[in-house]
Amino acid sequence: NEADVDALAERFFAEYNLKCKEQKESAPETADDYLDLAEQVTSKKKSVEYLHKALELEPDNLDARLQLILRTAEQPDERRLALQELLDAADKQMEKSGAFKEYAGEFWTAFETRPYMRVRYTYFDVLISCGMMRRAIDEGQRLLELCENDNLGVRYQLMHLYAYMEDEMHALALHKQFDSYEETQMLSLIHI
């Protein structure tokens, strides 16, 4: 009956509102909580503050360090240098944990190595922004070694870089590796 449905809906909304209030009142406890808060706020200053709090809890948190660089390093060269430093530290973390051996070729499928891949991909992107195409190509190739399925779509940017550098041999090898139509569109540019 209609009264029962109304009563049920009223009870649902009361419980839902109570849960929402409890969640708002609960203080962040983990670095991930602070990372979430940093993503949600619109103020750059507040976001940076939350990222610093995340790093107080987990100084080696790659996602927090990456986001801090993206929010504070304004110029591409400044970002590149900061990312290079972070990548060096991240490489040491991965080496120490044995991730390079354990997850070889499958870095994106392992939850533990995704922050590393985000750092590496961002570095790749910044190299392109800085016009450092040869270094970007090396980085793109490294990303494909770490994640053979290319879950990040690196092959598309890499194909553009090969075309830009007129590197037909590597472009054809990349096309053969992924054997898909999308990359063939760029192959014609190499012959121009």
Predicted regions mapped to residue ranges:
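Internal, conserved structured core segments that host functional sites
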Residues: 120-156
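N-terminal alpha-helical interaction modules that lie
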Residues: 1-114, 129-131, 137-145
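Conserved small/polar residues in nucleotide/adenosyl-binding loops
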Residues: 190-192
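Short coil turns that delineate tetratricopeptide repeat
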Residues: 59, 148-149, 182-183
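TPR repeat positional signature
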Residues: 34, 65, 120, 155, ...
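Alpha-helical linker/edge segments of TPR/alpha-solenoid repeat scaffolds
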Residues: 75-78, 114-118, 163-173
